[in-house]
Amino acid sequence: MLESCTLCPRSCKVNRLAGAAGYCTQDATVRLARAALHHWEEPPISGDTGSGTVFFSGCSLHCVYCQNQDISNGSIGREVSIERLAQIFLEQQGRDAHNINLVTPSHFAPQIVEALSRARAQGLKLPVVCNCSGYESLEALRIFDGHVDIYLTDFKYAFPERAERYSRASDYPQVASAALDEMYRQVGEYREDPQTGLLEKGVVVRHLLLPGGLSDSFAVMRLLAAKPYARKICVSLMSQYTPMPGCEQAFPELAEGIDPQDYDALIDYALDLGLDNSFCQEGEAASESFIPAFDYEGV
């Protein structure tokens, strides 16, 4: 599979087993930037003690406004074996993580599934979260089938021209829509533990409002509301957009934060469409530190 890689929708077909790096910037060796408890996910995922986040190096999307550019562009990452990855999962469980949270994992899907199988054999019992961009191939998602309990996925754009401008992926809307269907097929209806309030199964769809992007965000909400399972997933509306250094020259429209009135309008619009199983962020979210230090903690 990795000899002519088609794990992501870019389908670059490089031989990652021979050491070639794909569009994702990675060859076949798993590389991590951090493995530690994280408290900034949605409440049913972070809970009280935190989510056991494992940050994988590389990404198939490369959004111009990415807050994790140091790892998405492959400049940060430490090589780990499959056996070490399995041990990292078990170590997160030992730290009382509520779940194993795989951040941008799809380009390492076969290796991750092997590590999860080894960890399960050694006592891993936590639910597994696939925390991804939404730009996912059905091939990669089907590798995760039966191994992932929760999909925490972005749905970034409904307008192809915006997807092309900011992520060089004009096919993002249709790819993400098909991926969402597959995610729901695998894990089904959103379900929290009635005793703890922690998420056990289901899909959480994140959408980040971008500056000047309200009409696109409205279109994303319409697309989600039209899904036959719309009331059986959760939507997380995010206001934490932060301008990244250097972005303002090529993309001046992204140089400022979002308009709070736009965010309020987005919340109202989603609720009017019946997307009432949803999360929203407080006004100070963009000033808070959602970006951990990629310092190889836990790796």
What are these regions (language model features)?
Residues C24-G146, I150, F159-E161:
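Conserved Radical SAM active-site core
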Residues G52, I100, V128-C130, Y151-T153, ...:
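Hydrophobic faces of well-ordered beta-strands that scaffold small-molecule active sites
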Residues S72, A109, G134-S137, F155-P173, ...:
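Conserved radical SAM core fold
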Residues V80, H107, S167-V175, G212, ...:
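Alpha-helix N-cap and loop-to-helix initiation/capping positions
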Residues L116-P127, A178-Q186, P260-L266:
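Alpha-helix-loop-beta-strand connector modules within alpha/beta enzyme cores
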Residues D145-P160, I233-Y241:
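Non-cysteine beta-strand/loop elements that form the S-adenosyl-L-methionine
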